[in-house]
Swiss-Prot record:
It is an enzyme of class 6 (ligase). The keyword Nucleotide-binding applies. One of its GO terms (biological process) is tricarboxylic acid cycle. PROSITE patterns: SUCCINYL_COA_LIG_1, SUCCINYL_COA_LIG_2. This is Succinate--CoA ligase [ADP-forming] subunit alpha. The gene is sucD. InterPro entries: Cit_synth/succinyl-CoA_lig_AS, Citrt_syn/SCS-alpha_CS, CoA-bd, CoA_lig_alpha, NAD(P)-bd_dom_sf, SUCC_ACL_C, Succinyl-CoA_synth-like. CoA binds at T20, G21, S22, E23, K46, I108, T109, E110. It comes from Mycobacterium bovis (strain ATCC BAA-935 / AF2122/97). NCBIfam families: PRK05678.1 (NF004230), sucCoAalpha (TIGR01019). HAMAP family: Succ_CoA_alpha. PANTHER family: SUCCINATE--COA LIGASE [ADP_GDP-FORMING] SUBUNIT ALPHA, MITOCHONDRIAL, SUCCINYL-COA LIGASE SUBUNIT ALPHA.
Length: 303
């Protein structure tokens, strides 16, 4: 039986920008073990070399290192790229991927200056928005049993009817663990920076259209108005049940909590305001991650 997913499936061919770096080396190995079709990498200074890894079956494979994203796409047919380059080089790496018109770009890198991200996003828009960007500062995306583009542990759970979109990486893992017996179509960590590519709304819209996703779980956090905007969208566009959690109920005003985007100003951006907006849109909101998982389980089993 083939399971559907959103944005990423077993058919995607993946390249890694910065494949020779230490973090990229570790996660390339993990992605290959998870079944991801990694077809090569990019590092202009090491173009023409190869890196050796084990595939899912434990066989040694040599992955080619290319000088550019465009060349990698041309030679391998890649349609997904993952960025593992340091923050100072991230803007150029993102621009290069946009110029090559890669359909999906996952930016793992943490600590990219917000003005660099904002510049790259404007550039993508100007270029006709041919590239979907997930991140930055995120764990990426996993369609369990199919493919992993990012750093989410692949062995937590298998395929199933839950679609998950989260601002928090660690809460993504916790939610997958709590509902591991039920499984997930796709889980996306969208990142907690003030400027991100794929939003809650983008993911929720895709889950609504995905025939194999029966229930949507969204994890937000204090700061900004993304959750309020998602609530408005859900109200008019989503027929599937949605369960939510908002991290940061105990946050003091004006203090950044873990993510640069997680900051409360006045009554806007508080967890209570977000919970209220979501509940008004028919979303069941849990008080804790575990309570949220319990709500999801209860609703899913009653469908």
């Amino acid at each position: 039986m083939t399971h559907m997913s959103i944005f990423l499936s077993r058919d995607n061919k993946v390249i890694v920008q910065g494949i020779t770096g230490s973090e990229a080396t570790v996660h390339t190995a993990r992605m290959l073990r998870a079944g991801t079709q990694i077809v090569g990498g990019v590092n202009a200074r090491k173009a023409g070399t190869t890196v050796t890894h084990e595939d899912k079956g434990g066989r040694l494979i040599k992955l080619p290192v290319f000088g550019s994203v465009a060349e990698a796409m041309e030679k391998t047919g890649a349609d997904v790229s993952i960025i593992f380059v340091p923050p100072t080089f991230a803007k150029d790496a993102i621009i290069e991927a946009i110029d090559a018109e890669i359909p999906l770009l996952v930016v793992i890198t943490e600590g990219i200056p917000v003005q660099d991200t904002a510049y790259a996003w404007a550039y993508n828009l100007e270029a006709g928005h041919k590239t979907r960007i997930i991140g930055p500062n995120c764990p990426g995306i996993i369609s369990p049993g199919q493919s992993l583009a990012g750093i989410t542990p692949a062995n937590i759970t298998g395929p199933g009817p839950i679609g998950l979109v989260s601002k928090s990486g660690t809460l993504t893992y916790q939610m997958m663990f709590e509902l591991r017996d039920l499984g997930f179509s796709t889980a996306i960590g969208i990142g907690g920076d003030p400027v991100i590519g794929t939003t809650h709304i983008d993911a929720i819209e895709a889950f609504e259209k995905d025939p194999d996703t029966k229930l949507i779980v969204m994890i937000g956090e204090i700061g900004g108005d993304a959750e309020e905007r998602a609530a408005d969208f859900i109200k008019t566009n989503v027929s599937k049940p949605v369960v939510g959690y908002v991290a940061g109920f105990t946050a003091p005003e004006g203090k950044t909590m873990g993510h640069a985007g997680a900051i409360v100003s006045g009554s806007s951006g508080t967890a209570a305001a977000k919970q209220e907006a979501l509940e008004a849109a028919g979303v069941k909101v849990g008080k804790t991650p575990s309570a949220t998982a319990a709500l999801a389980r209860e609703i899913l089993l009653s469908l």
